[in-house]
């Protein structure tokens, strides 16, 4: 597919694309279109392998195996597991960084503090950790998490957070995981040349790894971030490029980890920092949220120094092209290799993770918990100096800006229900809320203009009285589209509209990042436990209408293992094998209760998800 005409669902991006394109600057849309005729049809189906020196091999009807003898199903699923491993590795890296930060904070070595003491005590109690001293508890929790993620035995975190019926099933299927590091070792060693070529075996190992990823690494890291930075609670903020004001010193925080961003906010809230910015000629200094780092902060922080979120990963080039950003602090995930080119717009690109390096940018201010304040101060000094040099007359002040409501963690949802989950359950039983769909998605150009499919499917779902929980880059898409605002209530079906007005909530609940998949699974567990049913029986489904990268694939595998019907688009690279397609879309449902549904038309996808939910309701007799 080639993107022509409107490149994005959002007018701000369409406008900035026109500017960048006219100036002849490399950008994601033009690069995507340039690749249209060069894409390998074998790769798109998962039928190309480059693992060993005997290849590359491509499978076709007249050449049904690779040189080693692997068939289409084995090749397709093995290729898919490689993507899944990368997603697991990134989530696990983040979890270890969170645990290290918690321990260093407990030892008094960071700029942070234990912000949610009750969450710490709750988590420690679940882990079987006792003690009265807050810092001692925090240190023990950090040690527990690091140990469990490395465990050779069954994961204690999975034991604690997974539903009983799921644990029994996973044991029966042989996919109950050990620590996530061990799962990575098993998966990686299996997916080498001439080791495991059985597509069912590879898929089961991927499921085991996905459970360790989402029910251990993800839940642990988000809980730790709640402990350190506060559990998300509903509050208003802003989205879209209009949050960028060229008259301010603007520091963008980009990636998936909130650590440096939170340190920047803590410093920016000091009057002497704001005064320093004003002396440089600025109105003040602001922190600007980009993609998941911005989303992590957005869910937790309500501060005048945090301007909000510009959008998801496809937005970053166009946001920098406004000429409003002074420093772009890049942590793990989703920093485009093209960004050094965008320094022509007056921004300084600074990696703040050892994972991130770019062409011509060989060094960074790599995050270490003990150095967070020092790193943040250096970034602020860089930004203020950059502001003095930046040509404000060339900056573009974008008008589009949305007021949004964010911060709907499980605790926040319970609070909105006055602490009584039965309010939600009764609404579902009566049909006022037909069901719930978790929208956990990236953004891509592969299936149409930027964010178009995501916005369309969300609008269709709420119109059908289906409540949406939004996570990931898809969450930012819906924020910029205004669907996480109270104004969006008018777009909902009559029954859902009444519920939203009664509870004072939007029809799309801004739940967090892709890392909140585990947190969403825990909320689903609470609902299943309250109803006394297993997860697959619930009128709940998942959609990833614009999945893009490796974190998304491991999240999807987990959703299926958890027992949820999971819609994905664009078409994943598994279609080269009928056996593999049948495994993911049919056979697995007989084992876990979950399955993959592939549909690129967002309207048809919404219809399919509604049908799934109605079938679940009928089976429950509601």
From Swiss-Prot:
Q: Which reaction does it catalyse?
A: CO + 2 oxidized [2Fe-2S]-[ferredoxin] + H2O = 2 reduced [2Fe-2S]-[ferredoxin] + CO2 + 2 H(+)
What residues bind [4Fe-4S] cluster 1, as annotated? 40
* EC number, as in UniProt: 1.2.7.4
Residues where [4Fe-4S] cluster 2 binds: 49, 52, 57, 68
GO MF entries: 4 iron, 4 sulfur cluster binding; anaerobic carbon-monoxide dehydrogenase activity; hydroxylamine reductase activity; nickel cation binding; peroxidase activity
* Keywords attached to this entry: 4Fe-4S, Iron, Iron-sulfur, Metal-binding, Nickel, Oxidoreductase
- A Pfam family: Prismane
Family per UniProt? Belongs to the Ni-containing carbon monoxide dehydrogenase family.
The record describes the protein's role as:
CODH oxidizes carbon monoxide coupled, via CooF, to the reduction of a hydrogen cation by a hydrogenase (possibly CooH).
Q: Assembly and partners?
A: Homodimer.
Which PANTHER family does the UniProt record give?
Answer: CARBON MONOXIDE DEHYDROGENASE (PTHR30109:SF4), HYDROXYLAMINE REDUCTASE (PTHR30109)
Name the UniProt record assigns to this protein: Carbon monoxide dehydrogenase
* Provenance organism: Archaeoglobus fulgidus (strain ATCC 49558 / DSM 4304 / JCM 9628 / NBRC 100126 / VC-16)
Q: Which gene encodes it?
A: cooS
């Amino acid at each position: 597919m080639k993107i022509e005409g409107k490149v994005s669902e959002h007018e701000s991006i369409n406008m900035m694309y026109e500017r960048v394109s006219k100036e002849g600057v490399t950008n994601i849309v033009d690069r995507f279109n340039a690749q249209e005729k060069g894409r390998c049809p074998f790769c798109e189906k998962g039928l190309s392998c480059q693992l060993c020196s005997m290849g590359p091999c491509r499978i076709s009807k007249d050449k049904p195996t690779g040189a080693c003898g692997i068939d289409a199903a084995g090749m397709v699923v093995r290729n898919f597991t490689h993507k899944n491993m990368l997603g697991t590795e990134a989530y696990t890296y983040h979890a270890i960084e969170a645990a290290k930060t918690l321990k260093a904070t407990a030892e008094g070595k960071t700029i942070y503090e234990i912000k949610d003491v009750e969450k710490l005590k709750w988590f420690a109690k679940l882990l079987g950790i006792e003690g009265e001293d807050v810092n001692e508890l925090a240190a023990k929790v950090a040690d527990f998490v690091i140990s469990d993620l490395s465990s050779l035995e069954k994961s204690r975190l999975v034991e604690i957070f997974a539903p009983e019926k799921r644990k029994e099933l996973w044991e029966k299927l042989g996919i109950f995981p050990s620590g996530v590091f061990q799962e990575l070792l098993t998966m990686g060693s299996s997916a080498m040349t001439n080791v495991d070529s059985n597509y069912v075996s590879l898929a089961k190992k991927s499921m085991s790894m996905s459970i360790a990823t989402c029910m251990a690494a993800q839940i642990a890291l988000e809980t730790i971030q709640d402990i350190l930075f506060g559990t998300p609670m509903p509050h208003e903020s802003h989205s879209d490029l209009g949050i960028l004001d060229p008259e301010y010193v603007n520091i963008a925080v980009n990636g998936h980890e909130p650590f440096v961003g939170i340190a920047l906010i803590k410093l920016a809230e000091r009057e002497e920092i704001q005064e320093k910015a004003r002396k440089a000629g600025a109105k003040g200094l602001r922190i600007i949220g980009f993609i998941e780092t911005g989303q992590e902060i957005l869910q937790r922080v309500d501060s005048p120094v945090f301007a909000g979120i510009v959008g998801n990963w496809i937005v970053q080039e166009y946001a920098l092209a406004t000429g409003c950003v002074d420093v772009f602090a890049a942590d793990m995930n989703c920093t485009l290799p093209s960004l050094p080119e965008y320094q022509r717009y007056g921004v300084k690109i600074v990696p703040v993770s050892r994972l991130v390096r770019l062409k011509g940018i060989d060094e960074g201010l790599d995050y270490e918990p003990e150095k967070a304040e020092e790193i943040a101060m250096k970034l602020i000094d860089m930004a203020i100096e950059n502001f003095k040099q930046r040509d404000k007359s060339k900056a573009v002040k974008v008008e589009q800006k949305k007021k949004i409501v964010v911060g709907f963690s499980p605790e926040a949802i319970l609070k909105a229900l006055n602490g009584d989950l039965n309010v939600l359950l009764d609404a579902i039983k009566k049909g006022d809320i037909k069901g719930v769909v978790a929208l956990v998605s990236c953004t891509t150009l592969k299936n149409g203009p930027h964010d178009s499919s995501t916005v369309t499917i969300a609008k269709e779902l709420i119109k059908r009285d289906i409540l949406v929980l939004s996570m990931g880059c898809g969450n930012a898409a819906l924020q910029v589209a205004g669907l996480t605002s109270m104004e969006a209530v008018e777009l909902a079906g009559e029954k859902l509209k009444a519920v939203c007005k009664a509870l004072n909530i939007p029809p799309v609940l801004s739940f967090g990042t892709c890392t909140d998949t585990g947190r969403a699974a825990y909320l689903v567990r609470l609902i299943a436990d309250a109803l006394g049913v297993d997860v697959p029986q619930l009128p709940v489904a998942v959609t990833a209408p614009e999945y893009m990268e490796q974190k998304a694939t491991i999240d999807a595998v987990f959703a299926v293992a958890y027992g949820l019907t999971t819609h994905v688009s664009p078409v994943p690279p598994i279609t080269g094998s009928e056996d593999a397609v049948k495994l993911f879309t049919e056979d697995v449902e007989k084992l876990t209760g979950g399955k993959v549904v592939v549909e690129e038309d967002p309207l048809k996808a919404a219809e399919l998800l509604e049908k799934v939910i109605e079938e679940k309701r009928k089976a429950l007799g509601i």
